[in-house]
Amino acid sequence: MMKFVVFLACLFVAAHSFAVEGEEEYFEAEVPELERAKALPPGSVCDGNESDCKCYGKWHKCRCPWKWHFTGEGPCTCEKGMKHTCITKLHCPNKAEWGLDWRSEESERSPC
C-alpha cells in the first residue's frame, strides 16, 4: 500500500512539472513581438491600433487626432497622458526598458 502511495505521488509530481514547463512557454508566446520591441520616444509617430506600451515611460500613450478614429487621417504620436495611462501601463512587458525613472516620483506610496 505504501509503495502505491509513493508511486502516485511521484507520478503527480512528474505530471505537474511538465504542466508548469508548458505554461512558461505559453506566457512567453502570449506577449506580441511589437510590445517587446524598443519603446518610442515622446513625440514620435505611433500606430493607434496597437498598445500604449510601445510609447516610452509610464505617463506616455499613443494619442491620435479626434478624426483619426473615423477617417484614419493624421499621424498618431506618443504624448503625455493622465494617471489612467500610468495605471494601464503597469503591466507592460517592456517597462524594464524605461529604467528606474519610470517609478521615480511617489515611489514609496504608489508606482503612479
Curated annotation (Swiss-Prot):
Proteolytically processed to yield the major and the minor chains. Keywords: Calcium channel impairing toxin, Disulfide bond, Ion channel impairing toxin, Neurotoxin, Presynaptic neurotoxin, Secreted, Signal, Toxin, Voltage-gated calcium channel impairing toxin. It is found in: Secreted. Expressed by the venom gland. Residues 1-19 form the signal peptide. GO terms for cellular component: extracellular region; host cell presynaptic membrane. GO terms for molecular function: calcium channel regulator activity; toxin activity. Pfam families: Toxin_34. It comes from the Eukaryota. Residues 20-36, 103-109 form a propeptide. Heterodimer of two subunits, a major chain and a minor chain, linked by a disulfide bond. Omega-agatoxins are antagonists of voltage-gated calcium channels. They block insect neuromuscular transmission presynaptically. This toxin is a blocker of L-type calcium channels (Cav/CACNA1). Belongs to the neurotoxin 04 (omega-agtx) family. 01 (type I omega-agtx) subfamily. This is Omega-agatoxin-1A. It comes from Agelenopsis aperta (North American funnel-web spider).
